[in-house]
């Protein structure tokens, strides 16, 4: 097909390919060989691994999809999508007012009591991969009298790592 982007271009140009954002990121980050993996962070996250020309089906909560088709060769991926990663930082800033900007999180987390056991499950809109539980609710646990802003921020950063680890493992 062709497009002129609804009149933006003087002439229509040919469409040579269409690709979703996560799949485009996989290709753009050079993950073109089986076993190569990428993580894309945004409001949520997409963890994707190139599995090559034959689909692999997992029973671990990740999905199989088509990566791309080039020159008659099809590549497949295993993918896990996480609902809340970057949005956790937005929650700290805009909803809780604990930080003025995302830049503050690293220093705050470093200053947290290393023995604090505060843990966040950011299921504000359910849980994505690998659990796929749309009814799950967010939980903050392990709070003690000494838990403060730094510990809550560290728990928020940790929950991003835990979710990525859950998908990869």
Task: Report the location of each language-model feature.
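Glycine-rich, acidic and aromatic/proline-enriched surface loops and short helix-turn segments
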Residues: 1
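Active-site core segments that coordinate phosphate-bearing ligands/cofactors
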Residues: 4-169
């Amino acid at each position: 097909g062709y497009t002129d982007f609804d009149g933006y271009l003087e002439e229509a140009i040919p469409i040579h390919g269409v690709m979703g954002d996560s799949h485009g990121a996989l290709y753009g980050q050079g993950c073109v060989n089986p076993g190569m993996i990428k993580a894309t962070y945004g409001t949520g996250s997409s963890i994707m691994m190139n599995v090559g020309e034959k689909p692999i089906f997992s029973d671990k909560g990740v999905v199989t999809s088509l990566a791309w088709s080039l020159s008659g060769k099809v590549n497949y991926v295993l993918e896990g999508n996480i609902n809340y990663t970057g949005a956790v930082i937005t929650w700290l800033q805009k909803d809780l007012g604990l930080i003025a900007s995302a830049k503050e999180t690293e220093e705050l987390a470093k200053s947290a009591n290393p023995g604090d056991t505060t843990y966040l499950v950011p299921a504000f809109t359910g849980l994505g991969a690998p659990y796929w539980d749309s009814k799950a609710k967010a939980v903050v646990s392990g709070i003690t009298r000494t838990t403060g802003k730094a510990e809550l921020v560290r728990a928020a950063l940790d929950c991003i790592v835990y979710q990525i680890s859950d998908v990869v493992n």
